[in-house]
Each structure stands twice: as C-alpha cells, then as structure tokens.
Amino acid sequence: MVWWTSYLILRCVSTTNLIDLTFYSLSLSGDWRQTLPVVPKGYKLDIIAVCVTKSSFWHAVNHLRLTVNMRVHNRDDSCSQAQRLQATAFADWLISVGDGLLHDPENETVVLPEDLLLPPGRKTIPQLIESVYKDLDVGRTEAQQIQYLCNRAILAARNRDVDDLNSAILHRMTSDMHIFPSADSSVDPSGTGMPSNTLFPSEFLNSINISGFPLHRLSLKIGCPIMLLRNLDPAAGLCNGTRLVVSQLSRWVIEAVIMTGPHAGKRSFIPCIPLSLSDNSRLPFNLQPLQFPVRLAFAMSINKVQGQSIRHLGLYLIEEIFSHGQLYVALSRAENKADVSILLNDTNAGLHGMTRNVVYQDVLQTV
C-alpha cells in the first residue's frame, strides 16, 4: 500500500487499527519541505505536534530518498545544454529554499533572484496579471481555452488576496457576467436542528467568507476556470481541488470541462447543492448555504496547488507567506525559472527582493 503526501497525515492515524506494522508494509511518500497539516489558529509547536513524525510508529519507518529531479530529467530533447544546466541550477536553488539554507534564520527572510521579480516600473497587480494572463480575452475554441488556462495560475498566501485577484482577472473577460447568490441559513448547533436565523439574520450569514467554502456572490463567465471544493464523484474526476473550465451556466447546474489529470477533457455537470459548515468553524451556529461548490481559479491559494505543475506562474507576495513550506511550494510549481513572475514590496529593511521564508528545521531533521 502506498500513501502519498504523508507530510499532510495527522499523527492520530496511529491510534487506529488500520496499520499493523507487524504484518503489513506501508509506503509513505512526500516532501517535508512542503506545507504541513493545517491547525486552525495553531502555532509552530501545535503544527509540529500533529505531524505523522510524532506518531508512535515513526521509529519503525525506513527512510529512502529520491535523488533524480524528474522535471529536469524529462525536459524536451530540443533543450540546449545551457537550458538543462539552468534548469538543474534552478532545481538545486529550490531545494536550498525548502531546506532553509538561503535565509536569515533570525528574521526568516530570503532575498529572491532579480530575474524572478517584476522589473522596476512594472510592480503592480495589473502587470502581474498581464505577465501570466496575456491575451486572456483573445477568441479561442473551447479546447484552446482549456490548453491556455491549464498552464497558468497566480498564487497568493491569503484567501482575501486570492479573491481580489480572481475578481480583477474575471473583469478582464468581455463575456457576460453571471452572478449566483447563495441561500444561506443557520442551525442551532445544540443538536435540535432548529433554525437560528432569528438570531443571525441572512445579511450577516451572507457576509461570512470561510476558506474551503464558495463565496456568497459567486461571479462566473463562460470560459473562466473554476476549482471544485467538494468530492462530488471521485471516480469521474470530480474531487476537491479539480480544476475545470466553464462551458455553460444555468441557475442550478454548471457545465464544465476538466482541465488536467486522467479525466482531462471530460465534460461534467456541477449542481447547486446544500453545504454544511460546523466542525472547527468557531461559529456559534452551523452554517448551511445552498450554492455551487466552486471558486474561481485564475488565482489560487498556495496550499491548494501542491502536486500541480504550472508553466506560467505568478506569485503575489505583497502579503508574505506565513507557514512552513509555502514559499517552497509556490516557487516549485514552475518547471522553468523564466516562467516565474513575482510581485512584492521592497519595503522590508530596504532590501530589494526580500521576502519571508518559514522553515521548521525541527520537522526536516526528523526525516
């Protein structure tokens, strides 16, 4: 049995009876330089404490290390020797970023290479968008639009920045805007199932914006990319994190085409469904909106793109990263250094290209 992305597994898995190391062999695969399990409102020690490295069976794990960078190894034969050397150097630099070898450990900062940054005079959000989504509104066939969008994304650390970027990019498309408001309700969490809308009016419920949930006012256009937020039909490729391109819109159903993966090109139908938010929401009620389980995907949060490759990559670092591995994950989505465009401020200690890089050496040293 192989378990991918083991760095996201909570240590509590060891409390189950699913793993018997005496009789079974379990392969755990993952890169511990990437982001770790999310602990709402948790601090460094809280996050480290829930990692699988703190499990009771970790002492029995035999560590094997991969040594060949497949992105470099699989580069097209048409690439010159100089391009291959550049790709190798970029891959080595990414490893150093992930290991925290390049940054100031006191301030958790690193200075990014000049050629990754937007040039002086172009350090604006519109220029970042233009560097990634140039010719966005050029007329294309559906297949061409899918090919264009699947290779592009702008990443940000915080969801509010992702929402702002998505809205700005969507308005660059000249096709008709369709707005789908959710029907929000709340239920008493005591278990009675009684509605609590009298205490929490719909205007307040509509204003709640929580990670992993669709927006109250979902704005979409035909030809825009979306990301699925729920597992609707994993066997058909409709999983949490699946990216699709909208082909048709109606009040209760979105028709969209899957962009990547083994189901790429498959036409799917996404219904408007009742959702529920209760566990760990820190709300005094259970939020139950009726909405399409999707968000725009021109821009995405860094934590959502682990495992994906992006050919034309933009990074919005005006708001710096805040957790272990986020900078490494963001930078390593690109295969080519020339395909990365980074927007950040030069206000940190007056140094050009300086940004935050959080690396938990306590975790890396255990693997």
Q: Which positions does each model-derived feature cover?
A:
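RecA-like helicase/translocase P-loop NTPase motor core
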Residues: 1-367
